[in-house]
């Protein structure tokens, strides 16, 4: 196939990001309202569902074994297709068992895709350009999310679209974009052949620790913040969509600049600033009793989270280039571990 100027690894990463966001952002935005309205979920059931969602994350380390059979790029396509199928089917199974099943299917695609995407990004991008490009990908994801939340706001607020229709459109869009990537982009090869076995290196200990602790923090945000908005403050689907739109407008405006900032000031200063800011945000979360203030904290947390790309660029600088694929799976598993532990400790199982 003759290659064109637009058929570059960077553009492929951008299209992958758009496809994933269209499906996953829809799933996340509708989840709390859908499970409460259609399946009468309580905190216990949502906790079980979120734990099921993390099971494939535990298995992310098996990525290296799959890569013995297929290329990383092809595996990314397959994972995105599975993600799209899982989301497309979600609206048609509004029962406890059905939601657990579709969540698991969606999660298999999502977690394997995220693992492979991290590996491919660090292989395809140079050390100098990685912070800026990773920041740009966050901005692209925010723009795609804005499209999703605008669609949700209009679809449920004015067009009265059903959950089934919205889920199917989102998952189908992801699947169609995946077919486009499969047929429209050539196979890119890594300059450095990747090791195809599991490994843990002592000199990567700080990267493992930062990734592990980041997983616990994200669980608080990903699960409790959204559920809090619906349960405590009575946010509707259109309210959640509007909040997410505001959030992603900020990310669209600042994410690329944050990536450039990380490249300029270095990973240590960037992460120090992030953690100091998050200390203030989560302290405020403990005392908030206003829906407006809760929404503001939600946006602030997302902005600080953009600085977490510094963890990836730090690893890119210290790692053996041949370790990207094998370490990505181990690192993603270390993100998932504290999440399930946190859910167990939260009392959702009791």
Give names to the regions the model predicted.
Residues 29-45, 223-240:
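Short amphipathic helix-loop junctions that connect adjacent transmembrane helices
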Residues 43-44, 127-137, 237-238, 321-331:
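Loop-to-transmembrane helix entry/capping segments in MFS-fold secondary transporters
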Residues 60-72, 156, 254-266, 350:
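Helix-to-loop junctions at the C-terminal end of transmembrane segments
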Residues 75-88, 269-284:
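Structural signature of the two symmetry-related core transmembrane helices
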Residues 91-102, 286-297:
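Helix-loop junctions at membrane interfaces in 12-TM secondary transporters
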Residues 112-125, 306-319:
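Intracellular juxtamembrane helix-capping segments at the cytosolic ends
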Residues 132-150, 334-342:
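Glycine-rich segments within core transmembrane alpha-helices of 12-TM secondary carriers
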Residues 152, 171-190:
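C-terminal membrane-cytosol helix-exit motif in multi-pass small-molecule transporters
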